[in-house]
């Protein structure tokens, strides 16, 4: 005998009813429907709406969202590296003059505005913006050394995050690698020998941004190779534009000493420098090529330049950051605002959250820059591993654990977010 149909009182709610019951969650309706369907399949007679809400909350946490970085890593790659200031999203839409010449009304170049400002900031004749530093290196080598040799010291055949390897970039560019010197010692005469014996069109100097070779070592400076007769490309990576840091009232911080910069590399004789926009430069993800105008022109005319060109949002953000440099307004660049906060200032903030948990900490630059560097900082220390608890907050708070103690470093937390940390700690007490 067939089962009797469920009465209206016993029937489970429809998928649409479940989705509408959890519509207070900030998700598009189709995703709420997905959560409802999955909940029905899992419910087994339980509270299907509560199950749908749990699933929807998990879905919500897979989307891109704001987080609070309390790790003390200033340029945290997993959290987008350098934070940038976003203009109000509530303003009405507008177009931009990205490729419009307002004087003639004709089509212009998207590179003219931001690139000219960047060139001015780092003392270059010209500059070109692409979508990341790997693209910058690839484009330069493809445009200037295709089917020819590029001399690189064996100590600088680096791999950074994401599997970016200099030898593989050279292979993709159409150039071929000419290894020079040894892992720990490379001299000028090694480059002379390589140039004499091979069809070398470029010397590529690569900054050891995420590791150090110490002990019995020797490197060849850019200034020692300027008379070798071929262009020198300096991939400084980290994006410091001027070692003197004229945008900082007290000059460069001690932890920055020794970091190569765009301006000083060019002054030393580099023909081109390449670096990231979202590291020490403090802007959006981008690759910047700066140097001699004739070489930049060759890069801009190469077909790859179209492939790796950035969009209007990137160019606009870069323009804003570069103007802040030119006007020497470090407070307008979030990275430098964080990096120059004093320990005393951080301790005052920590005391307002909880005097019980105040502790000294050590922040780090991160982002594959300045390996081994620690920056004196302050924050909060709680006994036990609470990283998952903090990560489940709204907004999520990302912190670190060491020896079963949870650390929240305030150097990387915007002061306006202290209240969220305060509220989360109160839940633990």
Model-derived features: where do they sit?
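Catalytic, metal-anchored helix/loop core of enzyme active sites in primary metabolism
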Residues: 51, 76, 99-103, 404, ...
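Long amphipathic alpha-helical segments
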Residues: 1-59, 63
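Conserved PLP-dependent catalytic core of the aminotransferase class-I/II
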Residues: 152, 314-315, 319-366
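Conserved C-terminal alpha-helix-loop-beta "cap" of PLP-dependent enzymes
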Residues: 347-421
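Short Gly/Ser/Thr- and Asp/Glu-enriched loop/turn motifs at secondary-structure junctions
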Residues: 12-13, 68-72, 281-284, 375, ...
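A short linear hydrophobic-aromatic micro-motif
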Residues: 63-64, 275, 395-400
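Glycine-rich phosphate-binding segment of PLP-dependent enzymes
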Residues: 36, 70-71, 81-105
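Conserved PLP-enzyme active-site core in the AAT-like
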Residues: 105-322, 354, 424
